């Protein structure tokens, strides 16, 4: 059997394993991008990159410590709990 034929056979055998049972459902794990939103500190709190403010369940942090960021344009992370 040729290499291409063998590769196709292996892919066909693995296809059922690659298909999740809950197709169309959102992933169960949050990605790192969803967990950490890097923003800058504006007037009155952490401002996410797209503008606006962190939600009530997010905390403005600097250097891994919860709290305010000190200066207006310090880098901060909006962490989802």
UniProtKB/Swiss-Prot annotation:
Keywords, ordered alphabetically: Disulfide bond, Neurotoxin, Secreted, Signal, Toxin
Keyword Secreted: yes
Gene Ontology CC terms: extracellular region
GO molecular function, a single term: toxin activity
Record's signal peptide: 1-20
Superkingdom as given in the UniProt entry: Eukaryota
Tissues where the protein occurs: Expressed by the venom duct.
Disulfide bonds: 46-69, 54-76, 60-78
Intracellular or extracellular location(s): Secreted
Main location: secreted
Propeptide residues according to the Swiss-Prot or TrEMBL record: 21-40
Swiss-Prot/TrEMBL domain comment: The cysteine framework is IX (C-C-C-C-C-C).
Entry protein name: Conotoxin Cl9.6
């Amino acid at each position: 059997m040729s290499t291409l034929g063998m590769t196709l056979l292996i892919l066909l055998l693995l296809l059922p394993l690659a298909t999740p049972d809950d197709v169309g459902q959102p992933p169960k794990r949050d990605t790192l991008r969803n967990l950490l939103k890097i923003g800058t500190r504006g007037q009155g709190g952490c401002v996410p990159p797209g503008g606006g403010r962190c939600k009530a369940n997010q905390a403005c942090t600097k250097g891994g410590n919860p709290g305010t960021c000190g200066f207006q344009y310090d880098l901060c992370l909006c962490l989802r709990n």
